[in-house]
């Protein structure tokens, strides 16, 4: 897909500011991923600065990975401000389905905010659609491509958003069309925060293209970077560092050569 390569160049030319209200586990790795790619991260969740910060950000990423009673109010306030300002909002419902707190928080944000992209694994997206038993902790317990296609389509229609269901094959839908992205590597599951980084990278691409193409661009670029990283470092610790390197090194030519993206009409 040519638009993925072009969006990579646009992103680096514009250096979008991505505001992340994310979890303690992944703040550092998420920021490094965005910096390596060519975006500017800010991790800001203080109530008193949200209005100013959201107003200057190119997009807002909300990640509920380390959710508690102190995180929820700034997430909700930022989502309301970003919706009013028509800024792209990307929601990562980490662990939805594992607990009622996570599921209900994600559902509340989906209900009142204008979410551009909902990105999660099979179990998380299934949970916000009311299908239980598919989440193990914050990891997906099972994955079936046909079910993932339907899940992505149904979530997009239900929440009037772009739904990205990630797994061995990623499926992205706006309810009218579906993209399948086959880039990536199983080693990503051995390093914490790779899904969260992907969500924030989608946030960066949301500053330069419409939601469905931003999601496809983010998943493709991160997936290719992971493939290239594993070729040089097949163990978790060095693999993580190499992913940063390839987020920095990836260019239009590599995207055009390595992208495995297919589009289907519904």
Swiss-Prot record:
E.C. numbers: 2.7.1.50
Major enzyme class: transferase
First and last residue of the signal peptide: none
Reaction equations catalysed: 5-(2-hydroxyethyl)-4-methylthiazole + ATP = 4-methyl-5-(2-phosphooxyethyl)-thiazole + ADP + H(+)
CDD domains assigned to the protein according to its UniProt record, in alphabetical order: THZ_kinase (cd01170)
Top-rank lineage group of the source organism: Archaea
Binding site for substrate: 43, 193
Any one Gene Ontology BP term: thiamine biosynthetic process
Entry's Gene Ontology molecular function annotations: ATP binding; hydroxyethylthiazole kinase activity; magnesium ion binding
Keyword annotations from UniProtKB, A to Z: ATP-binding, Kinase, Magnesium, Metal-binding, Nucleotide-binding, Thiamine biosynthesis, Transferase
Cofactor: Mg(2+)
Binding site for ATP: 119, 166
Biological pathway: Cofactor biosynthesis; thiamine diphosphate biosynthesis; 4-methyl-5-(2-phosphoethyl)-thiazole from 5-(2-hydroxyethyl)-4-methylthiazole: step 1/1
UniProt entry tagged with the keyword ATP-binding: yes
Physiological role: Catalyzes the phosphorylation of the hydroxyl group of 4-methyl-5-beta-hydroxyethylthiazole (THZ).
Family: Belongs to the Thz kinase family.
HAMAP family tied to this protein: Thz_kinase (MF_00228)
Official protein name in the record: Hydroxyethylthiazole kinase
């Amino acid at each position: 897909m040519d638009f993925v390569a072009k969006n990579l160049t646009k992103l680096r030319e514009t250096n979008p500011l991505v505001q992340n209200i994310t979890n303690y586990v992944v703040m550092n790795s998420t920021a490094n991923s965005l910096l390596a790619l060519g975006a500017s991260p800010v991790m800001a969740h203080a109530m008193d600065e949200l209005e100013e910060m959201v107003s200057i950000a190119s997009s807002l990423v909300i990640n509920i990975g380390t959710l508690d009673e102190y995180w929820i109010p700034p997430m909700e306030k930022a989502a309301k401000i970003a919706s009013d300002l028509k800024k792209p909002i990307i929601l990562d419902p980490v662990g939805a389905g594992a607990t009622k707190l996570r599921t209900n928080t994600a559902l509340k944000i989906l209900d009142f905010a204008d979410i551009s992209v909902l990105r999660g694994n099979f179990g998380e997206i299934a949970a916000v659609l009311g299908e239980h038993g598919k989440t193990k902790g914050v990891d997906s317990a099972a994955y079936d491509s046909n079910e993932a296609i339907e899940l992505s389509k149904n979530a997009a229609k239900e929440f009037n958003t772009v739904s990205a269901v990630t797994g061995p094959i990623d499926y992205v839908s706006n309810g009218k069309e579906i993209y399948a992205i086959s880039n990536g590597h199983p080693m990503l599951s051995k390093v914490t925060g790779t899904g969260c980084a992907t969500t924030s990278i989608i946030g960066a691409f949301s500053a330069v293209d419409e939601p469905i193409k931003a999601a496809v661009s983010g998943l493709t670029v991160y997936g290719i970077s992971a493939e290239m990283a594993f070729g040089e470092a097949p163990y978790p610790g060095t693999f993580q560092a190499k992913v940063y390197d390839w987020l920095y090194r990836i260019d239009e030519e590599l995207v055009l050569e390595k992208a495995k993206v297919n589009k289907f009409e519904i």
